[in-house]
Amino acid sequence: MVKKKKEKEKSKEIEEMDREIQNGAYSGRVMTEEQMEILRKQIAVYAVICDQLVLLHNSLSSYHPLSSGVRPMVGGYFDPMGASSSSHRISTRHRWTPTSTQLQILESIYDEGSGTPNRRRIREIATELSEHGQITETNVYNWFQNRRARSKRKQPQTTTANGQADDVAVTTEERRSCGDSGGLESYEHILFPSPDLGIEHLLSIGKFMET
């Protein structure tokens, strides 16, 4: 008797719940067809975004792992130690200080000529100065750019037509010397310019990148 009574009460509760749902009086979490359709669309969009993020992560993990600090041997996760060491190498790579002998030779060469030497002459100067300490062709190029910028800052602000023509000639020669080698080293001064470069040099680099 007790069992039948409980079953009867349960069936009665179910009937009342169905009746409330039909009348819209049930306050439970029931979604309409429109809400279900919106939810399906949101789930589909989320799945597409997840797939794109996975592809992006895989592509970044496989692109230059040593320079980006990512270590594929550890599952492709970001390695902060590797990233910090890589950034340290980049920041200290261009901190070159000439020796006293190198500086004397560079000053004498600068006094003999005018402006920045061409690519071949820079290579010869770097070879000569390498006997007195560590130096690269990029160091030589940047030194002449810095030296030329310092000289211009010391000159009066008035410029003649001849001076402007000389600047155009030097800029043309710099572009030609940069394009001779075709290697990355030729463009290191563009990617990592020295902080002492003058505004004229930065403007000439911008014009070179546009052409």
Swiss-Prot record:
Keywords tagged on the record: Developmental protein, DNA-binding, Homeobox, Nucleus, Transcription, Transcription regulation
UniProt subcellular location: Nucleus
Annotated DNA-binding residue span(s): 91-155
Keyword Transcription: yes
Pfam (any one): Homeodomain
Any GO BP: primary shoot apical meristem specification
Superkingdom: Eukaryota
InterPro entries xrefs: HD, Homeodomain-like_sf, WOX13-like
Region (Disordered): 147-183
Gene3D superfamilies: Homeodomain-like (1.10.10.60)
Biological function: Acts redundantly with WOX4 downstream of the TDR/PXY receptor kinase to regulate procambial cell proliferation and differentiation in vascular tissue, independently of any role in vascular. Involved in the regulation of gibberellin (GA) biosynthesis pathway. Positively regulates the expression of the GA biosynthesis gene GA3OX1, and negatively regulates the expression of GA2OX1 during secondary growth, which increases bioactive GA content in the inflorescence stem. Promotes vascular cell differentiation in the inflorescence stem.
Family: Belongs to the WUS homeobox family.
Misc: Overexpression of WOX14 increases bioactive gibberellin (GA) production and induces radial growth with strong lignification of vascular stem tissues.
Name of the protein described by the UniProt record: WUSCHEL-related homeobox 14
Organism: Arabidopsis thaliana (Mouse-ear cress)
Gene name for this UniProt entry: WOX14
